[in-house]
Swiss-Prot record:
Enzymatic reactions: 4-O-beta-D-glucopyranosyl-D-gluconate + phosphate = D-gluconate + alpha-D-glucose 1-phosphate
Taxonomic placement: Bacteria, Pseudomonadati, Pseudomonadota, Gammaproteobacteria, Lysobacterales
Protein role: Catalyzes the reversible phosphorolysis of cellobionic acid (4-O-beta-D-glucopyranosyl-D-gluconate), a probable step in cellulose degradation. May be part of a metabolic pathway where cellobionic acid is converted into alpha-D-glucose 1-phosphate and D-gluconic acid to enter glycolysis and the pentose phosphate pathway, respectively. Produces 4-O-beta-D-glucopyranosyl-D-glucuronate from alpha-D-glucose 1-phosphate and D-glucuronate with low activity in the synthetic direction.
EC numbers on record: 2.4.1.321
Similarity annotation: Belongs to the glycosyl hydrolase 94 family. Cellobionic acid phosphorylase subfamily.
Keywords: Carbohydrate metabolism, Cellulose degradation, Glycosyltransferase, Polysaccharide degradation, Transferase
Protein's name in the database: Cellobionic acid phosphorylase
BP-aspect Gene Ontology terms: cellulose catabolic process
Source species of the chain: Xanthomonas campestris pv. campestris (strain ATCC 33913 / DSM 3586 / NCPPB 528 / LMG 568 / P 25)
Enzyme class name: transferase
Gene3D superfamilies membership: 1.50.10.10, Glycoside hydrolase, family 65, N-terminal domain, Maltose phosphorylase, domain 3
UniProt pathway annotation: Glycan metabolism; cellulose degradation
Length: 798
């Protein structure tokens, strides 16, 4: 399609899924410049924008980079709203017409020449571009193998101009500032490409032994030898700048080494293409320890056969994370997300744990809650692994260590008090999906040698939550709860969390129910009574007349209340008060109205409002974040997902649909352009502060690391379609929005397949469920047989 600006009202001229839903295309590099896609494998991940910028990291075992900024970078985690600039790491291909001197670049950066046609295509298995300049079509494809940290690039140049063309092609992969200790770059004929070498900086002797096996080389290998090369960034760029490098303007690259200069990887190929002729080039780009590893990677991958074998293996790897539901509804965008992209994102989180060695405990448990629907055995193992690090007090650590030698880093060095809450939440979902009640009796041994059953460890965790309360019965917050940067409410040891108080009630409620269903009546009674006590404390101390306060500071100041000019109302306490049964009918009506009036935006409900505009030092650093960004009043999709789940739990189907649909770009062009997000993932937030900063409200963070996805997948399965495990049965209690006349679902559940047709019938007053033509009086499917297919007809009131 033309790369010109899209038509104002036809979203399909800007972006659209392929017919089979396996890919999503964007037809402009300028309308949504930060939109893109991501790939990962067991060792690495790479996020690519439609314009060619890239952010990549691999594990050794901690995250590391092989393409760097051109200046000294601080080590950090994946960032929301990653800023891009001319010298940002990327993967670029310059194309020069040798007869006219015209210069282009693909995908779009750095030359930024307008293309005749442009298509960026995010796929499940690879990322592609198809760009046409002056009759020359350049097709790029990047993919990953399953187990090695290497990018596999294919570039096809096709002459569609109708005349013979003389061209030069220049793959240019900047390497950046690798190290202040040692960095270099040069061409290796023996290895077949450019190899850049460095030493990760260190000063302590112990670090030498820890780092000596690091992959400190970065390579760009070619299948076909080039006519020339450059390995020095400044020599390549020269006086022309990246948009017109001096080396590219010359007849031939200068074969420059980099000797303690910023290295780069640039190759030159000369092409003479007859009309309709095409040439294909393949490259491998990534990190390595030494020449032997580089040579092995070249032998393994750098051929047509190697690329094909890697693609086949990677497709099988992703197949292991296929979803358990396929849907057909009146909303095609929802269908595409749920059928293709949402389970992929859930799998990414649970399979590689966000590519970290110490995931936050809450993230680890929620990510693996999602895996309960894709790979239940993996989810089970994650629960047992997490509990193996439980403290003798019953508390859970701030992070879960995944490999030997891993340490708690960054936010995991800050004490938070919510981690025990997520254990029964995980179990509630896991048991409903699998029926694996035997896990409750599984024995888990901790580092101190103590061996206890899962059930006993949950008892201890729930008791820890009850003990970690003040005299009023409210939960201490320390330096944060789910909201990490709420770090100054209770740093002196007195402040309490309103959210954690009702979340504790919800956790106790779930665990009491699990105990009751599994013959643990004494514990069910004990924790059931505790639910009533915690809820009573929340209503006595936190109810502000129309909604629940967010907390009470060390100095006894309630916040998140009507008297506050900023941060007047927070979403999370309201959502979890619904889940915990804290709010009675009158309170429920009041808080739902308050959320709609004060938190709703066209892009979903914000996390708090109004956003803070200055530091409030009895709340914490979240108030220093930009208004509407992240925890300071963004449409923070993880919190939105909690609210969505709570709405389904109280049976508010239409309000829930409104919230669910707002997570997706569109359906109109203006909404999609404002968000700038390609719907191949759910981002961790869209900008908030809609009333304060409307120009940027709705803008996507583009960050695909988010606890949102497991909850949204659960909401679709168990809320929207109501297909949820209940003991040994599958319950059917759908909550379709009232304007949907019908929907179809194919659900995999406990080894059986359920083909469900849902129809809304005018005049009907009661839900009816037929299983293979026979009415089910309790709207459940009993006696499920693995391997069997069940036909369900579900008739909903009109």
């Amino acid at each position: 399609m033309s790369a010109a600006s899209p038509a104002p009202d036809d979203l399909a001229t800007l972006m659209a899924p392929s017919a089979d839903g396996m890919r999503y295309a964007l037809y402009s590099p300028t309308a949504m410049p930060t939109a893109g896609g991501f790939l990962w494998n067991r060792r690495m991940m790479v996020q690519l924008t439609c314009r060619g910028y890239a952010t990549a990291q691999f594990m050794q075992p901690e995250p590391a980079k092989y393409a760097h900024a051109p200046l000294l970078e601080a080590r950090n985690f994946m960032m929301p709203e990653q800023p891009y600039y001319a010298h940002h790491p990327g993967r670029f291909f310059y194309l020069k017409d040798e007869d006219t001197g015209a210069l282009y670049s693909v995908p779009h950066e750095p030359v930024r020449a307008p293309a005749e046609t442009f298509e960026f295509s995010a796929g499940k298995h690879d990322v592609r571009w198809r760009v046409r300049h002056d009759g020359i079509v350049v097709e790029l494809c990047v993919s990953l193998p399953t187990d090695d940290a290497v990018e596999l690039w294919e570039c096809r140049v096709h002459n569609q101009s109708g005349r013979t063309r003389r061209l030069s092609l220049y793959p240019y992969f900047p390497i950046g500032y690798m190290s202040w200790m040692h960095q270099s770059g040069g061409y290796s004929p023996e290895l077949g490409g450019i190899v850049c070498r460095s030493v990760t900086p260190y000063q302590k002797v112990d670090d030498y032994f820890r780092q000596r096996d690091f992959k400190d080389c970065t390579f760009l290998l070619h299948e076909q030898p080039p006519v020339a090369w450059d390995a020095q960034q400044m020599a390549f760029e020269g006086e022309g700048g990246l948009h017109a490098p001096s080396a590219v303007q010359a007849e031939q690259l200068g074969n420059h080494d980099a000797h303690y200069e910023n290295p780069a990887a640039a190759l030159q190929y000369r092409l003479s293409l007859a009309p309709d002729a095409a040439t294909v080039y393949r490259f491998a780009f990534g990190p390595a320890k030494d020449d032997a590893e580089i040579a092995a990677l070249r032998a393994r991958y750098l051929s047509a056969e190697g690329f094909a074998a890697a693609a086949q293996d990677y497709a099988q790897y992703l197949q292991a994370g296929r979803g358990c539901v396929q849907i057909a509804t009146p909303d095609a965008a929802l269908d595409n997300l749920v059928n293709h992209w949402l389970p992929r994102q859930v799998f990414y989180h649970g399979d590689v744990n966000r590519l970290t060695t110490d995931p936050q405990t809450r993230n680890y448990l929620q990510d693996h809650m999602g895996m309960a629907y894709l790979q239940p055995a993996t989810a089970r193992a994650a629960l047992l692994h997490a509990l193996s690090q439980q403290e003798p007090s019953g508390a859970m650590p701030d992070g879960i260590l995944l490999v030997e030698g891993a340490e708690l880093k960054y936010i995991n060095q800050v004490p938070h008090t919510d981690h025990c809450v997520w254990l029964p939440i995980f179990l509630d979902a896991y048991l409903a999906e699998t029926g694996d009640v035997a896990v409750l009796d599984a024995v888990v041994r901790t580092h101190d040698g103590q061996a206890l059953s899962v059930a006993a460890r949950l008892d201890a965790a729930m008791q820890w939550l009850l003990d970690a309360r003040d005299a009023r019965g409210l939960s201490f917050i320390a330096q944060g709860d789910w909201n990490d940067p709420m770090n100054m409410v209770g740093w002196r040891g007195v402040g309490v969390s309103g959210w954690l108080t009702v979340a504790t009630a919800y956790a106790l409620r779930l665990w009491s129910g699990i105990c009751a269903a599994n013959g643990r009546s004494a514990q069910a009674t004990q924790f059931g009574q505790a639910v009533e006590e915690v809820n009573a404390a929340a209503n006595r101390e936190l109810w502000d007349g129309h909604w629940y306060a967010r907390g009470i500071t060390d100095d006894g100041v309630r916040f998140g209340i009507a008297d506050d000019e900023e941060g007047r109302i927070y979403l999370n306490p309201q959502s979890w008060a619904l889940l915990a049964g804290t709010a009675d009918a009158e309170q429920r009506t009041a808080l739902l109205a308050a959320v709609r009036e004060q938190l709703h935006t066209p892009y979903g409900p914000v996390m708090l409002a109004p956003a803070y505009t200055h530091m409030r030092d009895d709340v914490g650093r979240l108030t220093q974040k930009w208004p509407g960004a992240a925890e300071n009043g963004a449409v923070y999709n993880h919190a939105v997902a909690f609210y969505l789940y709570s709405l389904y739990q109280i049976g508010d189907a239409d309000r829930a649909w409104e919230i669910l649909r707002a997570m997706l770009p569109g359906p109109d062009m203006a909404d999609a352009l404002q968000r700038g997000h390609l719907p191949v993932s759910l981002p961790n937030y869209y900008r908030g502060a809609w009333h304060q900063y409307p120009r940027t409200a709705g803008r996507s963070s583009q960050l695909f690391n988010t606890g949102t996805v497991a909850w949204v997948y659960r909401c679709v399965l168990e809320g929207l379609f109501g297909l949820v495990g209940d003991g040994d049965a599958l319950a059917v209690r759908p909550q379709l929005p009232s304007h949907w006349p019908q929907a179809q679902v194919t659900r995999q559940f406990r080894g059986a397949q359920f083909e469900v047709a849902l129809t809304r019938e005018p005049g009907r007053t009661q839900l009816e469920v037929q299983v293979d033509g026979v009415v089910s009086p309790d709207q459940r499917v009993h006696g499920i047989v693995a391997g069997r297919t069940y036909q369900l007809q579900v008739r909903l009131p009109g």
